[in-house]
Design a protein with these regions (language model features):
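A broad, low-specificity signal marking well-ordered, structured residues that form hydrophobic/aromatic
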Residues: 23, 38, 145-147
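Short, contiguous acidic/charged loop-to-helix segments that flank catalytic cores in large enzymes
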Residues: 2, 42-47, 118-121
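A short linear hydrophobic-aromatic micro-motif
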Residues: 22-28
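C-terminal regions of mature proteins
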Residues: 74-177
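Hydrophobic side chains in beta-strands
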Residues: 27, 42, 149-151
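M16/insulysin-pitrilysin zinc metalloprotease superfamily fold
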Residues: 6, 10, 14, 30-93, ...
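His/Glu-based metal-binding/catalytic segments typifying zinc-dependent metallopeptidases
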Residues: 1-17, 41, 164-177
Length: 177
């Protein structure tokens, strides 16, 4: 949670404000099947998907140093923000249902997960997170899924090959458990 929050604004600032790559620029995180994912997205009318991918990759390489360079005050603000988010009670029956469903099916009915996460957040140090991020994004260990979509007006300058031609056929070939 802290890593995702720490990278949101710098990614937006660099990709949208500084490089002016596109109007839609965002990043987020997701936990699924005990895996933690970071998402980075850019939609552009001016730049092709392979160029956006290259620019995002260059930014992602700088993430550990961004975290290391963060001030202690900023890190504490991110820590408190993450804790506050976890302490928020669901505001509707729908939100509560989604939260319970996630706890049951994604986290083996670990109903005290938020409390454990809050405890871990309180005890983690900035340098620990930076080192973890460095390991995760290292050349030998990083795992990425890149979804590149080319608009009709954009050419595939890198000559990237598509892994499928028809989305419907591709979806039929997926096995979901």
């Amino acid at each position: 949670m802290i890593i995702s929050q720490a990278l949101k604004q710098p990614f937006f600032t660099e990709m949208r404000t500084n490089q002016q790559l596109g109007y839609i620029v965002w990043s987020s995180n997701l936990n699924r099947d005990e895996n933690h994912y970071l998402y980075f997205a850019i939609q552009s009318g001016e730049y092709s998907a392979d160029e956006l991918n290259h620019r995002a990759d260059e930014f992602i390489k700088t993430c550990p140093s961004l975290l290391k360079a963060m001030s202690a005050d900023m890190f504490e603000q991110l820590r408190e923000s993450a804790i506050e988010k976890l302490e928020q009670k669901p505001k509707s029956i729908s939100e509560r249902s989604i939260k319970l469903t996630t706890l049951i099916f994604e986290h083996n009915a670990e109903f005290d997960r938020d409390e454990k996460t809050i405890s871990a957040i309180r005890n983690v140090e900035k340098n620990e997170l930076a080192e973890t991020l460095e390991k995760i994004l290292g050349e030998d260990s990083h795992r990425m899924v890149n979804c590149l979509m080319f608009a009709d007006g954009h050419s595939n300058t890198a000559g990237l090959a598509s892994t499928f031609e028809d989305v419907r056929d591709w979806k039929k070939s997926r096995i979901y458990k």
